[in-house]
């Protein structure tokens, strides 16, 4: 249906209202796309202003348009803007890290585990710092984001993580184009994996596995410049 230039092909699975003509004259230039990519960054200085719903809808639509393995299209999206629920996400993450820190500092566990997991122990001071900042009323997890986008899949999806992170990048670039800051919630995902349960998913009414999480907010300022990344490591095999 999509490839036919004259519209002569029809299919019951793809009704006319679901197919759209591409106006290639409206495509951004390669330079514009590259500028969008290079200007995107995790701006953690956020205001208390909510992200307008129409912007959130565009961000979700961009995520939904990402490719999926075997064209499964099995991604689902949950947008959280309820301040109480956002607080619960932070509380949950801090709680998991606090329990982990206490376990790692148990004398018996420390004696057995530390020689083999030195990299893990370097995070104990980080966990404790996050806990103290959280107790002081700061928001070291969500950075005062006013919205969360959770991307989730059925647990049976073998490529759920890959699909979700492809969708995340689409959403991230759309958010950047809208002037909305976006931050990858690595701490929250780490807590989910560490706990190994569905606690947060159940709290948020999500049926499935949370694969990627984006915090969203209106930035307090925009960066006027970007800095080049490290030198590209590349190799062409010809």
Please tell me what each predicted stretch does.
Residues 1-238:
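Acidic, surface-exposed loops and disordered segments
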